[in-house]
A protein has these predicted regions:
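Hydrophobic ligand-binding cavity/cleft-lining segments
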Residues: 1-59, 64-65
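Hydrophobic pocket/interface hotspot
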Residues: 16-20, 123, 157
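Beta-strand/loop substructures that line and gate deep hydrophobic ligand-binding cavities in soluble
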Residues: 49-52, 76, 81, 89-143
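Short, charged, solvent-exposed linker or helix-capping segments at domain edges/interfaces
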Residues: 63-66, 134-136
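Extended Gly/Ser/Thr-rich low-complexity repeat segments
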Residues: 65-73
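Low-complexity, acidic/polar, glycine-enriched regions of mature
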Residues: 69, 87-88
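A conserved amphipathic terminal alpha-helix motif
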Residues: 71, 77-79, 83-84, 135-163
């Protein structure tokens, strides 16, 4: 199931990139999403910047049909591989993620680019729940949970961009 989101910031692409690759920002985002525990790493790999976030979450608001797959908690692991900036400062990232020990995966791209006087951060994900018969029924719940987390992260990004 496809998930597309974007947020606009009163900042340059370089400033938005600095925010999304800041360990403290990612840790605050984990706290905003009520992670029970988390691990954030930001590292360089050649000209790429790799952001890996692993967060343990309570499995609340999970449909009964999914509860047997996740238990009381779930661990969400997301990796963004941000590529070198283009001449205009824009950047793209490959995004991959999973809910550990479940048949849930996500894959897609993210982009930071100038749009007039603002900068837009956009994400385009394909979320899959690989469970015969019920996977397609579970995907909307997973997408809604991811959308909620991304919205909290975008809201926090606005706070950071305003500093």
């Amino acid at each position: 199931m496809e998930l597309k989101m974007s947020a606009s910031y009163d900042a340059t692409p370089e400033e938005v990139f600095a925010i999304v690759t800041d360990t403290a920002f990612r840790e605050q985002a984990c706290e905003k999403t009520k992670a029970l525990s988390y691990d954030v790493t930001v590292s360089a790999s050649g000209t790429d910047t790799v952001v890996r976030v692993s967060r343990k979450m309570e499995a609340t608001d999970i449909p009964d049909m999914a509860r047997k797959f996740v238990g009381e908690t779930l661990t969400v692991v997301q990796t963004e591989t941000w590529h070198a900036a283009a001449a205009d400062g824009s950047r793209t990232a490959d995004v991959a993620g999973e809910i550990a020990n479940t048949p849930v995966t996500l894959k897609g791209t993210a982009r930071i680019a100038r749009d007039g006087a603002q900068t837009v951060q956009a994400i385009d994900l394909d979320v899959k729940v690989a469970v015969p018969l019920i996977g397609k029924k579970m995907e909307p719940f997973v997408v809604d949970a991811i959308r909620s987390g991304l919205q909290k992260e975008h809201d926090l990004g606005h706070d950071w961009a305003g500093k």
